[in-house]
Amino acid sequence: SYYQHYLRTEDIRIPGVIEVLAELAEDYDMAIVTTCKRRDFEVIHPNDDILHFMQFVLAREDYVYSKPHPEPYLMALNKFSAPAEQALVIEDSERGLQAARAASIDCAIVDNHFTRGHDFSQAQYRLKTLAELPQLLRAT
């Protein structure tokens, strides 16, 4: 499909993500909760360096209701055996923010050019780049 071709040929990685995840992995458990189908996720992240920082990945096939429903994030909390108060969702979409809030999890939005016009007024935190995340976590 066009979408999979695009994913295979375009570099859509976030600059500096490996360094940020390496720093965070020293103190935090992390997972990816995505609305992508697992097949598309694997196209985006084949043998990707970010996966070894993650305890697990939840893809679209792993849950019944997609974001903005809270189910994906509630499932992640369950897998971590963690209460919402001990979690922070990092999002870049309005639907993801809505899902995090519906699951009663604090959410930090990382700005990107695709979601400039979205309503992120319910986010607890706003980050210009992912590189700001370690400092935010140290401050909270």
Please report, for each region that a protein language model flagged, where it lies by residue.
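Glycine-centered short loops/turns at secondary-structure junctions
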Residues: 27-28, 104
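Short, flexible loop segments at the rims of nucleotide/cofactor-binding pockets, characterized by
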Residues: 7-11, 35, 104
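Asp-based, Mg2+/Mn2+-dependent phosphohydrolase catalytic module
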Residues: 22, 37-140
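Metal-dependent phosphoesterase signature
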Residues: 1-22
